[in-house]
Each structure stands twice: as C-alpha cells, then as structure tokens.
C-alpha cells in the first residue's frame, strides 16, 4: 500500500469523518489545506440512486460553468469541407476527417474534448472503445454532435463540462481550480449539481443523491451531506 505524503496526511487529519459537510464548508476546508506548487483541480463525485443499465436512468448532460474551468480545453473536431474550415476559424485545435479518425484509432489522444458533425458519425462511431471510456465520445445530448461547430467549440473553450453516470452509479465532474474564490467554486458546483438534479429520472424512487464527496488533485475527499446539495 502506497504511503501518503505528509501534506496529504495533514489534510486528512483536518477532515472530521463523523461529519457531513455542506458544499460551502467542504470548499472552505479544501482551501485551508496545505498548499502545493501548482493550481489543483477541484472535483466532485455524486453517488446516484440509479441503474445505468436502464436507458431511462442513464444520467448525462453538460453545463457551462459560470466561472469557467480554469483551463483552456484542447478541442478536436471531426468535420469535412466548409465545416472543417469553420471549426478552425472558431478556434478548434485539431480538425480532420477520415485520416484523423484513423489517427485516433491508432492511439492519438492529445485532446480534451471532441466535436463531430452528424455526417462524420458513421466513421467516428467505431472509436467508441477508445473515446467512450474516457468520456470523449461525441453525443447530440451534450451538443457535441452538431452542425453548429462554432457554438460547440465556443462553449467548450468557455468552460463547458460534460458529465455522465458510470456503471456503478457514480457521477464525477471537475468544477474549477483551487485558486478560484470560494464563491466562484460554489457557484460552479451548484450549476452542475442543479442540472444533475433537474435530470433526475422519473422512475427513480426515494433519495436521488445518496452520497457525495468534494476533493482536489492532491487532497483526500471531503464527505458532503447529500441533503445540502
């Protein structure tokens, strides 16, 4: 078992494991923890009372964070002709069609988000095994399969985050950097959490969010009271 660093252990000691924190309290606690020499990413994980094997309980969506993500995403676009030109003009980092599909199939993964025009999905579909597990597969529900490539690229570059519940019912998302103000982080967290709640499947009975944690890159997860979300 790997040994944790002194800073990690110090951070862990500050967390009361018998307590469930509000999101605001968890964020404040994170910001009080020992500093590192880089700007950590802040993340949340929500455990949902859903069965992702059922199509009507596969919770997924996207949100434009009110205060951005703190990083500029590298966007890859699958498009041809005029739409490829439009994508480049809109700020896409990598644009291509069949050759790019082949490149990704062979292991190229130097990008953060993927957009595709509908006519490319016949070819892009075979990348499911590569892109799917990484949460990168384009999907109309998240606005990443579209003819409006300009809007999709601008949204992603402007701080859009996609989320999807995994096979175990966990839904994770990034919502900023530790250097953000506590208020900005809370606003970002609430924006995603509110959208997740809005997407609650009608067939789910009882409590929807059953467990939650907030953490940052180098710090342990802080337990959050689902009732406070």
Curated annotation (Swiss-Prot):
Coiled coil: none annotated. Gene3D superfamilies: 3.30.190.20, 3.40.50.790. One of its GO terms (biological process) is regulation of translation. Keywords: Repressor, Ribonucleoprotein, Ribosomal protein, RNA-binding, rRNA-binding, Translation regulation, tRNA-binding. GO terms for cellular component: large ribosomal subunit. The keyword Protein biosynthesis does not apply. It holds the Pfam family Ribosomal_L1. InterPro entries: Ribosom_uL1_bac-type (IPR005878), Ribosomal_uL1 (IPR002143), Ribosomal_uL1-like (IPR023674), Ribosomal_uL1/biogenesis (IPR028364), Ribosomal_uL1_3-a/b-sand (IPR016095), Ribosomal_uL1_CS (IPR023673). Disulfide bonds: none annotated. Belongs to the universal ribosomal protein uL1 family. Part of the 50S ribosomal subunit. This is Large ribosomal subunit protein uL1. It comes from Bifidobacterium animalis subsp. lactis (strain AD011).
């Amino acid at each position: 078992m790997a040994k944790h660093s002194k800073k990690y252990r110090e951070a862990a000691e500050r967390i009361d494991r018998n307590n469930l924190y509000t999101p605001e309290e968890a964020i404040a606690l994170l910001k009080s923890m020992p500093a590192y020499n880089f700007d950590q990413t802040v993340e949340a994980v929500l455990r949902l009372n859903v069965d992702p094997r059922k199509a009507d309980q596969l919770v997924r969506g996207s949100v434009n964070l009110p205060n951005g993500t703190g990083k500029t995403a590298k966007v890859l676009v699958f498009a041809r002709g005029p739409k490829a030109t439009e994508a480049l003009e809109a700020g896409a980092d990598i644009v291509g069609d069949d050759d790019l599909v082949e490149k990704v199939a062979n292991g190229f993964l130097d990008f953060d988000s993927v957009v595709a025009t509908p006519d490319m999905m016949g070819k892009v579909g075979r990348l499911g095994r590569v892109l799917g597990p990484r949460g990168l597969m384009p999907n109309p529900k998240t606005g990443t399969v579209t003819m409006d490539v300009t809007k999709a690229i601008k949204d992603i570059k402007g701080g859009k985050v996609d989320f999807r519940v995994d096979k175990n019912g966990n839904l994770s998302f990034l919502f900023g950097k530790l250097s953000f103000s506590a208020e900005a982080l809370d606003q970002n967290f609430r924006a995603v959490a509110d959208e997740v709640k809005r997407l609650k499947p009608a067939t789910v009975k009882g409590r929807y969010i059953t467990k939650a944690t907030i953490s940052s890159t180098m710090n342990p997860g802080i337990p959050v009271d689902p009732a406070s979300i």
